[in-house]
């Protein structure tokens, strides 16, 4: 879905269409349980999972412009039907951009994990740390504070893992590498996805 189309919809309309599209895809090709489920914002939507991880059964249920709060509110539609063995989550970037505090985002991830485990106690999760993007560089300190809190939470449960992408996405000047982003300075380029795929691969076993 194009960004322009998303912005023309209300949040309720946007989510209704996204969930209807997922339902249609599931009816056409029902995904078996035990897959690796990717959820989150446009960073997940744009990831070519079949190309990046050809040997792994993946399901992409990313939604444009979505937040971590959105994921928590829709676990029954985004997660539970798929009974995944592993969830890969990238979300929270948009929450921070909308004014949420680091503490609020970290609490949302804790809620997400506990709500999933209430129904799927064996499911593991990988939280991809919030990325340092050129467009949102002014928010990097809040992003890093969020990452620190979520990393700390992940260290207390073997079902959780935190994938830190911050340092490897910076150049010699300690600023985000432009080659890892498309022109908008927010979304990942093919080089960015290649880097992330390499970093994530060991977690998918």
Name each model-derived stretch.
Residues 4-85:
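Serine-esterase "nucleophile elbow" of acetyl-processing enzymes
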Residues 51-53, 73-205:
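Alpha-helical cap/lid subdomain in secreted, periplasmic
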């Amino acid at each position: 879905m194009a960004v322009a189309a998303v912005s023309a919809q209300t949040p309720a309309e946007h989510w209704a269409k996204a969930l209807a599209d997922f339902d249609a895809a599931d009816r056409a090709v029902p995904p078996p349980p035990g897959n690796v489920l990717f959820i989150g914002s446009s960073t997940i939507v744009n990831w070519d999972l079949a190309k990046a991880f050809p040997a792994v059964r993946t399901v992409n249920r990313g939604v444009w412009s979505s937040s971590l709060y959105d994921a928590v509110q829709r676990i029954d539609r985004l997660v539970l039907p798929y009974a995944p063995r592993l969830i890969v989550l990238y979300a929270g970037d948009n929450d921070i951009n909308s004014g949420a505090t680091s503490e609020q985002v970290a609490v949302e991830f804790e809620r997400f994990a506990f709500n999933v485990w209430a129904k799927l106690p064996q499911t593991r999760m990988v939280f991809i740390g919030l990325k340092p993007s050129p467009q949102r560089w002014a928010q990097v300190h809040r992003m890093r504070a969020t990452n620190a809190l979520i990393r700390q939470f992940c260290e207390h449960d073997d079902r959780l893992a935190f994938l830190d992408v911050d340092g490897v996405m910076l150049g010699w000047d300690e600023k985000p590498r432009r080659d890892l982003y498309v022109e908008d300075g927010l979304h990942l380029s093919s080089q960015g996805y290649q880097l992330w795929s390499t970093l994530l691969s060991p977690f998918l076993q």
